[in-house]
Amino acid sequence: DLLDPISLFDGEKETRLSQFWPYVFGKAKSLDSMDVSRYSDLMAKSQFMVARDTIGSIKINKGIKWLDVGGGSGAFASELVKKHPSLKISIFDIPGSNADNQSHNFISGSFFTDQIPTGFDTISCIRVLYDHNDQTVSDLLTKIYSALPLGGKIIISEPMLGELSPNKWGDTYFATYTYAMKTGKTRSPSQVADLLVKNGFSKVKVFPSRRPFVTTVIEAHKN
């Protein structure tokens, strides 16, 4: 897409990136197995650093039940189990995204059309929110809030905008990425926190980022 940046930023052409991510537009039911597989494969290959920084930032209690929304083939879940083998982890994602990994409990569904499964102490969204516009994110957070028990926790982890001043990865690279995707947006930690509070969450905590170009981690609670 950036081979022709003028057309990209003028909005004159259909971008290749938007064609690569049809799931973002709620077209999960129209995706074939190859579409789903290539998406999950790319996410898995780039998930290791995100998983490491996320898991290293937060406190995780033993034996809790954890749901990873949009967890694909289980790259994040696999790293989580390595560090915390007592966790009971499930993945909620569109059909076919776990085709090459049967080691985790997989719950098939789309958060566009289905409710978030219940019975979990913690629900994570790893590189999910920035793929979507504010209304879609708000709807998702409302569903997650409803699915969590009192005292339950949500974990958000993804690249974010600079808070007090722009940064080259969030404000430039990922902002261009979401622009080319034709949906979604990178947000600052305070913008994500505002969305969480507006949808019922409290005790929002933004963790110091180890590598902002990889991810920033936020947790919030249902009380």
In which residue ranges do the predicted regions lie?
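Alpha-helical subdomain
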Residues: 60, 69-223
